[in-house]
Amino acid sequence: ARDAMLRFPIDDLVDEQRCHDLLLRVLHPDGLRCPRGHALPPDQAPHDRHRAPILDYRCRECGAVYNLFTGSIWCRSRLRCSKIVLMLRGIAQGVPTIHLAEELGLDRSHLLRRRHQIQSLIEEGLFSLDPIRSDHRS
């Protein structure tokens, strides 16, 4: 009966911009900054928009190019914001890796590596899933 289970394309039902905004709050609680710590000016236009809503910016101070994922475990990730938010939500809720991987269409071993990275960061006090748990807006 396991194969007969109804699967919803949940990541297609989640708003990318809202997921981006949540990740921005989680990954950069003090605002987006370049890798050298220079703040993103509120009036600065993106350097590159090809992955919107993930926008690349070029720092006006040092010239470094950065985005939402720079300096995080998601650096160089090609996953959509919605997929990452749903992954974090599943981990926060204790969903078994195999079920989460099936639901999100991800490789189980890749998801397991990410889960271990996230759990290590939480243990070191460098990351919290609280904003994911408490973000109940739909």
Language model segments and positions:
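Residue-level recognition of single "structural anchor" positions
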Residues: 1-138
